[in-house]
């Protein structure tokens, strides 16, 4: 059983673990229990009803939060020529082709949060799959990170577009803001994220798609959300 810090145990006293909280109350509580000295990230954890044994039910896509995540997103783009120029002008942090592939392979360079590639670059970066894949950084058409429209993709990821995927237990974890966000912005981000996840329901999933939702801060306890009221928002 993992040992929790004194701060965590103190914060947990405020949370009734048998209760399912309405969203407004949960937001108040998650901010109250985020007591670390840094600006903690507020995270939404969604348990889905997918069968992970069936690859066609795996979820991978992107969610655009109206107020972003509060985190500065470092974007790397694999592109050449005009596309490379457009990516730089759109605000990409790193742009290159074979040179970036080599930097990642030989130097272990991973100082970025999102990797985008033009379709013609996939042949070049294919060998990075073993490095970027396990870290969720490998460009993919499903996540909108393989595209000819690199400038648009860079701008969206910089603004708050985030990649989401189900883990091996069928859960999705989404950063929805920072403790410093006002309550209304957090609420709008959470509602928007849930609506977008609902639209990703695989055709083969039977029964309830979203089975449970929990809100927490980086270092704080989980706060269970009242699904009925959340899905009505």
Swiss-Prot record:
One of its GO terms (molecular function) is rRNA binding. Pfam families: Ribosomal_L1 (PF00687). CDD domains: Ribosomal_L1. Transmembrane segments: none annotated. SUPFAM superfamilies: Ribosomal protein L1 (SSF56808). GO terms for cellular component: large ribosomal subunit. One of its GO terms (biological process) is regulation of translation. Keywords: Repressor, Ribonucleoprotein, Ribosomal protein, RNA-binding, rRNA-binding, Translation regulation, tRNA-binding. PROSITE patterns: RIBOSOMAL_L1. It comes from the Bacteria. NCBIfam families: rplA_bact (TIGR01169). Binds directly to 23S rRNA. The L1 stalk is quite mobile in the ribosome, and is involved in E site tRNA release. Protein L1 is also a translational repressor protein, it controls the translation of the L11 operon by binding to its mRNA. Part of the 50S ribosomal subunit. Belongs to the universal ribosomal protein uL1 family. This is Large ribosomal subunit protein uL1. It comes from Thermotoga petrophila (strain ATCC BAA-488 / DSM 13995 / JCM 10881 / RKU-1). The gene is rplA.
């Amino acid at each position: 059983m993992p040992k929790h810090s004194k701060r965590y145990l103190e914060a947990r006293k405020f949370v009734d673990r048998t209760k399912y909280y309405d969203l407004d109350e949960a937001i108040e509580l998650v901010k109250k229990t985020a007591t670390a000295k840094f600006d903690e990230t507020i995270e939404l954890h969604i348990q889905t009803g997918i069968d992970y044994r069936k690859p066609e039910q795996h979820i991978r896509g992107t969610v655009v939060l109206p107020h972003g995540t509060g985190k500065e997103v470092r974007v790397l783009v694999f592109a050449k020529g005009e596309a490379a120029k457009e990516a730089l002008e759109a605000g990409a942090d790193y742009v290159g082709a074979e040179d970036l592939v080599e930097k990642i392979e030989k130097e272990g360079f991973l100082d970025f949060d999102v990797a985008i590639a033009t379709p013609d670059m996939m042949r070049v970066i294919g060998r990075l799959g073993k490095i970027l894949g396990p870290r969720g950084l490998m460009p993919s058409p499903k996540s909108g990170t393989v595209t000819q429209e690199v400038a648009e993709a860079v701008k969206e990821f910089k603004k708050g577009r985030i990649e989401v995927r189900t883990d091996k237990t069928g859960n999705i974890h989404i950063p929805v803001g920072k403790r410093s966000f006002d309550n209304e912005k957090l609420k709008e981000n959470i509602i928007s994220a849930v609506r977008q996840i609902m639209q990703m329901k695989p055709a083969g999933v039977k029964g309830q798609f979203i089975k449970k939702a929990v809100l927490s801060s980086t270092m704080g306890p989980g706060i269970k959300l009242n699904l009925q009221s959340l899905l009505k928002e």
